A protein has these predicted regions:
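Auxiliary, metal-adjacent structural segments of Zn-dependent hydrolase domains
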Residues: 2-66
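Short pre-active-site segment immediately N-terminal to the catalytic Zn-binding motif
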Residues: 56-73, 86-89, 93
Length: 113
């Protein structure tokens, strides 16, 4: 399953909110855009584990200090959207799709496409 990449205007607004107001407000903006419940951002490296820098569980995305960046936030947002919509897919496929989603959102915004 693929989640549609927002329009350039929405992507630019996300980046602006992220830079000026922080990642939680930016994620709130995108969850409103997609019409799903809010995903909470938690900066707590102890909850992450397994050498990962971020993880998603039950409407919360946990990040280490090192892992809190736009790309990882968008990656975990994909997991949230898949969870809320009840999509069933293999862990590997979901990880690949989450990476692809984050890359497309950032590349299309920063690359002026």
């Amino acid at each position: 399953m693929r989640i549609r990449v927002p329009s350039k205007k929405i992507r630019e607004r996300f980046l602006l909110i992220y830079e000026l107001k922080g990642c939680q407000k930016a994620v709130d903006f995108l969850t409103r855009y997609y019409g799903v419940r809010r995903m909470r951002i938690v900066l707590n490296g102890r909850k992450v584990g397994n050498g990962d820098i971020a993880c998603y569980e039950d409407n919360k995305a946990y990040f280490t200090k090192r892992g809190l960046n736009k790309s990882n936030v968008l990656h975990e947002l994909y997991h949230h959207l898949a969870y809320v919509d009840g999509w069933e897919m293999s862990e590997r496929r979901e990880e690949m799709e989450a990476d692809r989603y984050a890359r497309k959102v950032l590349r299309k915004t920063i690359g002026n496409s």
